[in-house]
């Protein structure tokens, strides 16, 4: 795909994203598919601040539970752009239920594909140029979306990432791992 096609695709996604009203479950499903693609495929990490808030509770397989989704998400997202700049999010399914008064609940299944860039910084040095294919691991994500202080926010998120496949695939390619785990430790939700 050439530059013009990439820009046209991005513009079409942005057009939907910035004009969506979240009035039906179908719009919610489409909005969060577009949202995910804009962040991961078009490297728009700043969009994290559109739907995550200080009250977001995130439950991540292998890490635990923390509060403060927008900052944690940005810290985890930015370094991955260098490691695999051509990552694609392949949506297998996304489904939403709910309404504009009570809020929405959606679930999605994705798999990723791309290349670990030889120019990308990693814990072990530069990436090795290896590829990861669609369907090599799946990400399951479930979110609750409600109004917080007058705007739509993800208030609770549950993520299962196929961690073993990711660990094998990304051995020595996540320079931010120690830092991000220390960051999460400070955000852990206290048990009541």
Model-found features: residue ranges?
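Short, low-complexity N-terminal intrinsically disordered segments enriched in polar/charged residues
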Residues: 1-51, 184-192
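A solvent-exposed, acidic/Ser-Thr-rich amphipathic alpha-helical stretch
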Residues: 33, 45-118
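Low-complexity, intrinsically disordered terminal/linker segments enriched in charged
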Residues: 2-15, 129-132, 137, 155-192
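Exposed beta-sheet edge and beta->alpha loop/turn motif
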Residues: 107-150, 163-177
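Soluble or luminal CAZymes and related metallo-dependent hydrolases
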Residues: 27, 31, 72, 137
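Catalytic cores of transferase enzymes with a strong primary signal for eukaryotic protein kinases
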Residues: 83, 90-94, 121, 141-146, ...
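Residues embedded in well-ordered beta-strands within globular domains across many folds
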Residues: 57, 95, 153, 158-159
């Amino acid at each position: 795909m050439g530059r013009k096609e990439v820009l046209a695709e991005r513009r079409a996604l942005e057009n939907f994203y910035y004009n969506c009203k979240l009035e039906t479950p179908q719009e919610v499903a489409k909005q969060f598919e577009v949202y995910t693609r804009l962040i991961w495929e078009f490297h728009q990490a700043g969009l994290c601040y559109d739907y995550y808030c200080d009250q977001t509770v995130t439950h991540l397989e292998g890490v635990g539970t923390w509060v403060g989704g927008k900052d944690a998400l940005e810290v985890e997202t930015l370094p991955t752009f260098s490691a695999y700049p051509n990552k694609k999010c392949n949506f297998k399914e996304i489904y939403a239920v709910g309404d504009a008064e009570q809020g929405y609940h959606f679930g999605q299944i994705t798999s990723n594909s791309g290349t670990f860039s030889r120019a990308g910084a990693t814990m072990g040095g530069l990436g090795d140029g290896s590829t990861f294919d669609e369907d090599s691991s799946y990400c399951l994500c479930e979110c609750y979306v409600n109004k917080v202080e007058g705007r739509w926010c993800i208030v609770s998120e549950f993520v299962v990432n196929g961690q073993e496949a990711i660990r094998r695939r990304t051995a020595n390619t996540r320079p931010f791992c120690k830092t991000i785990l220390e960051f999460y430790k400070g955000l852990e939700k206290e048990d009541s």
